[in-house]
Design a protein with these regions (language model features):
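Glycine-rich phosphate-binding loop of ATP-dependent small-molecule kinases
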Residues: 1-212
């Protein structure tokens, strides 16, 4: 895990030096089996905003806040299918990585760095702003004998807003409303601390990485 984290941190440094990461829209059109389409294009890194790209042909516009909200239920349904597939495929001893951090903190950039080295592991690339959902998924992970890791990317909120949220929106990637942004940055650290305490006895590992 420590080596995997080194790859992620290296990618964050490249972004800080100007080599930003913006998730591109796949050239392959979505197929009837959205989970297979997703895995071919994004790998085992589960991300709601990537799932929304399956609906561009249906009118999804990542730069439009109303469109982002409109297609959130559809993309959430795809994510649920992917998580079901994850639990069907992952074997005991493998790892599920839970990303955590406010919007624009650099989670997906970090994931871009570890993507080639995941092997049989999976990543849930989300903010971890929902304590209930994270708790439920962690319970399932440990129930099947897999390992769980939380990687919390920490970034100054205004830096995350200016050089994370606004910059990616300017490049045509997904936008984030300010109120959602503020909620995640206020909530995530407490959620990580709560989960760390509750699941310590089951072997949950937590890594906190500052993205400066």
């Amino acid at each position: 895990m420590r080596q995997l984290i080194k790859y992620g941190k290296k990618r964050l440094k490249k972004a800080a030096a100007g080599n930003d990461f913006f998730q591109k829209v796949p050239e392959e059109l979505p197929q009837e089996d959205l989970t297979a389409w997703y895995l071919r294009n994004f790998g085992r890194i589960i991300n709601t905003d990537c799932a929304k790209m399956a609906f561009i042909k249906d009118g999804y516009m990542p730069y439009d806040p109303e469109s982002v909200a409109k297609f959130h239920p559809d993309s959430s349904a795809v994510v649920k299918l992917l998580i079901s597939k994850m639990f069907a495929e992952i074997s005991p001893g493998k790892t599920v990585i839970f990303m955590a951090g406010g919007n624009g903190s650099g989670k997906s950039t970090f994931c871009d760095g570890i993507r080639p080295y995941l092997e049989g592991d999976w990543v849930i690339d989300a903010t971890l702003a929902s304590l209930e959902a994270a708790h439920r998924t962690l319970e399932e992970v440990f129930a099947i004998g897999a390992n769980a890791v939380i990687i919390h990317i920490i970034r100054d909120p205004e830096e995350a807003w200016e050089n994370g949220v606004l910059k990616r929106a300017a490049h045509g990637s997904h936008c984030t409303p300010r109120n959602v942004f503020e909620f995640t940055h206020k909530t995530v650290a407490d959620n990580v601390a709560t989960l760390e305490q509750e699941f310590a006895s089951k072997g949950l590992q937590v890594y906190r990485i500052e993205n400066k």
